[in-house]
Amino acid sequence: MSAKRTFTRIGAILGATALAGVTLTACGDSSGGDGFLAAIENGSVNVGTKYDQPGLGLRNPDNSMSGLDVDVAEYVVNSIADDKGWDHPTIEWRESPSAQRETLIQNGEVDMIAATYSINAGRSESVNFGGPYLLTHQALLVRQDDDRIETLEDLDNGLILCSVSGSTPAQKVKDVLPGVQLQEYDTYSSCVEALSQGNVDALTTDATILFGYSQQYEGDFRVVEMEKDGEPFTDEYYGIGLKKDDQEGTDAINAALERMYADGTFQRLLTENLGEDSVVVEEGTPGDLSFLDAS
């Protein structure tokens, strides 16, 4: 499928929505070595996602899950079940911080991960990726009243930049702006708290994530776009991770993503979860990882 451009404005965050047949788990039994498709056929799938990212992966006060990654994962699992003639399985959610994603997959603690999981060459050495299912770009979150930061270059004045352990955005900034001081936390929500308290000067990660926080704490923060030589600072392709060399599972995920685009579900989920106020999000081309050749 050729890449299709879908434009969405990230704004209102989808309210808490109870998901039928979905439960949360801190650990949970794994279907491990049986493979991703076997887990679906057996009726229980452990899915990793974020618990603290509004509009993408969020555990709500009533313990239901909401967000684009949550909805995409649920669609993929159930679409594969429908295609195979199986019953829809129970989905058990597992929190998957950035630094733990590969380990959770390799240890069989989850069957798949949809957690703002940017595909890159290093990660592809240890896990398989279905997708990509969207393309976003790196940006900055700063305090609303802080006028020191309007461009990427403004960080190169000894300012403190926050990101999450195991994620790549902050190091990419450090590579081009050596004067930046890095501060890492385990979760983006911890970075947001540090930013609000003035302990860091900016948070960097994907624009999709940052607009979710900007909307959740409306009036407290603003998003600053990042460019290099007039182009987006980075391209971030989100994929669905599963065990290395599970090609059958990978192919099934890609086919489900194609169905999600074709029936209009992806555009609907974008609008429901991320609203219509800012930032361009582009559909991915499932199975096309040619961008890794340039990384």
Curated annotation (Swiss-Prot):
The complex is composed of two ATP-binding proteins (GluA), two transmembrane proteins (GluC and GluD) and a solute-binding protein (GluB). Residues 1-26 form the signal peptide. It is found in: Cell membrane. Binding of glutamate or asparatate induces a higher thermal stability of the protein structure. Belongs to the bacterial solute-binding protein 3 family. InterPro entries: Bact_solute-bind_prot3, SBP_3_CS, Solute-binding_3/MltF_N. A lipid is attached at C27 (S-diacylglycerol cysteine). One of its GO terms (biological process) is amino acid transport. It comes from Corynebacterium glutamicum (strain ATCC 13032 / DSM 20300 / JCM 1318 / BCRC 11384 / CCUG 27702 / LMG 3730 / NBRC 12168 / NCIMB 10025 / NRRL B-2784 / 534). Part of the ABC transporter complex GluABCD involved in glutamate uptake. Binds glutamate with a high affinity. Also binds aspartate with high affinity, suggesting that GluB could be involved in the transport of both amino acid residues into the cell. Gene3D superfamilies: Periplasmic binding protein-like II (3.40.190.10). A lipid is attached at C27 (N-palmitoyl cysteine). It is a lipid-anchor. SUPFAM superfamilies: Periplasmic binding protein-like II. This is Glutamate-binding protein GluB. Pfam families: SBP_bac_3 (PF00497). SMART domains: PBPb. The keyword Protease does not apply. Disruption phenotype: Deletion of the gluABCD cluster almost abolishes glutamate uptake activity. Keywords: Amino-acid transport, Cell membrane, Lipoprotein, Membrane, Palmitate, Signal, Transport. GO terms for cellular component: extracellular region; outer membrane-bounded periplasmic space; plasma membrane. It comes from the Bacteria.
